[in-house]
Structures are given as C-alpha cells and as structure tokens.
Regions:
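An alpha-helical, amphipathic repeat domain used for nucleic-acid recognition
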Residues: 1-154
Length: 154
C-alpha cells in the first residue's frame, strides 16, 4: 500500500466511523473533491475497495440521521433523499433496505413536516393535507397527513 493509499484508507475509515452514512458515490466524491480531501481517484477507489464497507448499514445510518433531524420525512421522501444524486446517492435497494431497518414513527414524521409548514403560515386543513400527501411534496399517506393536521390544530 502506498502512502497516498494509506492516507485515503484512513480518511475513508474516519468518514465511515462518524455514523453519518455514506453511499459509495458519496464517499468517493468526498475523498476526491477539491472541497473534500482531494485524493486522486485511484487512491480513493483503492480505499473504498480495501475497506469494503457495508453499504446497507451506511444507508441505515444515513436514514436514521434524517429521521432524527425532525424535518419530517415520509417513507417515500426518505427513499428519494437517500437515492437522489443530489442527496446521498444510495442505490434503490440500499434505500429500501434502510427503510426496512430503521425504527420510524411515520405519524410523528408527518407531524414534524406539518409543523414546518405551519411556521410558514397560510395553510388550511385541506391544503396542508394536500401538501403532505403530494408526491411532489412530502409523500405521506392520507392517514398520516390527516393525523398530522389534527396534531397541529387544523
């Protein structure tokens, strides 16, 4: 192992142990980005292959991080965040694994999302439920959205 490869391995291990949850794409970007570590692509790829992380567990870690932020993620919204190239860049299978291996109170997540919208103001019960259930919005189920609307006083 070269010195540069060892440094890339050490850096990758540090990122992976933080518990944030990195996808392979995300870790590779972090290691090679000039705003990140700036390693050469071959050294970063070596580090990732050398460490052979459990990407499913990384997806679970990322999902837990989002769920703990109190932003209000639906199951659909969380999958979109995890798989988006502008989000985490996990595969669909890794995101679905994460969804199936996190404890998520989707009703509570809907309430968190509803509280965020109510801070912006201007929502009727109907418009809030529509926003929460919209596939271009949050993607909560009708029942989750109705529960959230009732919990924020609508």
């Amino acid at each position: 192992m070269t010195s540069a490869q060892q440094q890339a391995v050490d850096s990758a291990q540090s990122y992976l142990s933080e518990g944030q949850g990195f996808s392979e794409q995300g870790l590779l970007s972090q290691l090679t980005s000039s705003a990140g570590d700036g390693f050469l692509m071959p050294d970063a790829e070596f580090a990732i292959h050398y460490l052979n992380p459990n990407w499913d567990q990384q997806a679970v870690d990322a999902a837990n991080g989002y769920l703990n932020e109190a932003q209000g993620f639906s199951e659909q919204g969380l999958i979109q965040q995890l798989t988006s190239s502008s989000g985490n860049g996990f595969t669909q299978a890794q995101a679905e694994y994460a969804i199936n291996h996190v404890y998520a109170d989707w009703d509570a997540q809907a309430v968190d999302a509803a509280k965020g919208y109510m801070q912006m103001g201007g929502f009727s019960q109907e418009s809030l439920i529509q926003q929460l259930t919209s596939s271009s919005g949050n993607g909560f189920t009708q029942a989750q959205a109705e529960y959230a609307a009732s919990k924020v006083g609508l």
